[in-house]
């Protein structure tokens, strides 16, 4: 009996989709990642970045994924951010870099798009460009970026307060980033936080993925369950 064509197509499609998925973290060690060893480790099955009073970061530093520079992709992971007391009342600042470039390899520093996160109630979910144009979209905004860093707010994808209410402080949350051409979308716990179309010539079309550990007061950030889907 010959296979039904539609069934063959379905199996092939599923195989290709599976082949395009990649786990970026083995849950055991930092194989495939590179950063400053005094800050990064694996604890309780999660990538852990930590600064302390005894070992502060002199500037923002990053853990950089070593296996490519994705262009169009969907990236999901879980993150947890806490202050020095293991809560969310104090300082805590991190982010997921994408389509970024290494600018200071000796201290693992990158520049580029950042899906931002913090312990506070304002910036978690915004699109920021590290060492570049700064804030590109506030939480809840739909924007188009023109030449000369002209940012046009064209609509909204949600209310900032509602997005914040869905974020679990000092607990695990899910970040999703979707990048296709100049269209960038970010989601936290299923809620879209920004929708950005970068039409400028400086908008990166591909680059490294990295995790930020922000300079400042002691804090801890953890990441796990990375899945990268590419076209």
Give the ranges of each region predicted by the language model.
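Hydrophobic h-region of N-terminal signal peptides that target proteins for export
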Residues: 10-19
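Carbohydrate-interacting regions of secretory-pathway proteins
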Residues: 18-231
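Bacterial N-terminal signal peptides that target proteins for export
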Residues: 1-8
């Amino acid at each position: 009996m010959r296979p039904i064509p539609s069934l063959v197509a379905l199996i092939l499609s599923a195989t290709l989709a599976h082949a395009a998925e990649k786990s970026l973290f083995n849950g055991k060690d930092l194989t495939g990642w590179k950063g400053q060893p005094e800050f990064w480790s694996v604890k309780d099955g999660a990538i852990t970045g930590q600064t302390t009073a005894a070992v502060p970061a002199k500037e923002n530093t990053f853990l950089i994924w070593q296996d490519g520079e994705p262009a169009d992709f969907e990236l999901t992971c879980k993150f947890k951010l806490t202050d020095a007391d293991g809560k969310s009342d104090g300082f805590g600042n991190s982010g997921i870099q994408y389509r970024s470039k290494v600018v200071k390899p000796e201290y693992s520093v990158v520049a580029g798009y950042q899906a931002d996160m913090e312990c506070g109630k304002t910036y978690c979910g915004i699109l920021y460009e590290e060492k570049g144009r700064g804030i590109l979209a506030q939480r809840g905004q739909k924007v188009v970026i023109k030449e000369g860093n002209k940012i046009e707010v064209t609509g909204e994808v949600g209310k900032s307060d509602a997005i914040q209410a869905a974020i679990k402080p000092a607990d695990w949350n899910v970040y999703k980033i979707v990048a296709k051409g100049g269209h960038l979308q970010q989601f936290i716990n299923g809620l879209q936080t920004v929708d950005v179309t970068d039409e400028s010539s400086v908008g990166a079309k591909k680059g490294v993925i990295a995790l930020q550990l922000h300079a400042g007061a002691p804090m801890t950030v953890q990441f796990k369950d990375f899945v990268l889907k590419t076209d």
